[in-house]
Amino acid sequence: MAAPFKTLVEDYPRYLKSFELFLERSSEHQCMQDFIHNTLPDILASIGGGRSVFNVMGVGSGAGDIDLEMLAQLHLKHPHVKVDNEVVEPSNDMLYKYKARVSTSPDLAYINFTWNKMTASEFEKQWQEKTPEKKMDFIHMIQMLYYVKDPNATVSFFRSLLEKDGKLLIILVSGESGWGKLWTTFRKQLCYTEMSQCVTIGEIKSFLDSEGVPYRKYVLLSQMDITECFTEGDQEGELLLDFLTEVKEFSKNAPERLKKEVLDVLRHPDCSKEVDGRIIFNNNLEVLVIEP
């Protein structure tokens, strides 16, 4: 049964504010950038089969900052290759920011961008109707499987689009992170049946294992300062609590008992550690690299 709250993503301006605060308070983008610069190039070395044009797809690309860093690494590894880049992103605001970033970025002439303002499921339907035979060299799905109805089916579909030497890259929170503990404890109270907000990489690995699909995995160490969550009435703390629970105005709308239980779990050693009087949440991510 769906939880009796409004989900944060229903209020896009508040979601965006909480997401931007999360990025400010966490090392998430830094750990992704480290992975992109230090590990991804070797993963990308074997794709493309010597073709002169690579087909690349970003699913849930957001404002494109991480996409463009990956494309830059791809270009360094394959400097003479052109790229057809499919961008799948349902948010007008994010697509606008992505396009603005492209327009002010030098040296992107080797990339042809196709903009798809739609969800992953809408894109899947369109793809099957228009270009079912087309194959991709590299697909990335970064922190987006929380927002699909069936994460396993979504992974299976996009994996089916890969060239024989293609790669599908997925980044999600680790099952051993603070998110894993929080969601395991409060799945019934906080998670929604129509959106799989509580999925971790552990569940995707279990699915792939059950299907006999091999993958490589990498852990990205990340943390987030959530100290303000424990100060009653602190606006930034309330925004972070919204982001952590995926509930709009959780502090105002949650029953006192649930609020106390959530805060207790957030302080628990399985979720966070105390460093110099600050509460530091375990925001570890994992990367899966999947082949056809």
From Swiss-Prot:
Listed GO biological process terms: histamine catabolic process; methylation
Binding site for S-adenosyl-L-methionine: G60, E89, I142
Top-rank taxon, per record: Eukaryota
The keyword Disulfide bond belongs to this UniProt entry's keyword annotation: no
The keyword S-adenosyl-L-methionine is assigned to this record: yes
Known catalytic reactions: histamine + S-adenosyl-L-methionine = N(tau)-methylhistamine + S-adenosyl-L-homocysteine + H(+)
E.C. number(s) listed in UniProt: 2.1.1.8
Alphabetically ordered keywords of this record: Cytoplasm, Methyltransferase, S-adenosyl-L-methionine, Transferase
Any one GO cellular component localisation term in the record: cytoplasm
MF terms in GO: histamine N-methyltransferase activity
SUPFAM superfamilies, sorted: S-adenosyl-L-methionine-dependent methyltransferases (SSF53335)
Binding site for substrate: E28, N283
Location relative to the cell: Cytoplasm
Quaternary structure (record): Monomer.
Task of the protein: Inactivates histamine by N-methylation. Plays an important role in degrading histamine and in regulating the airway response to histamine.
Family to which this protein belongs: Belongs to the class I-like SAM-binding methyltransferase superfamily. HNMT family.
UniProt protein name: Histamine N-methyltransferase
High-level lineage: Eukaryota, Metazoa, Chordata, Craniata, Vertebrata
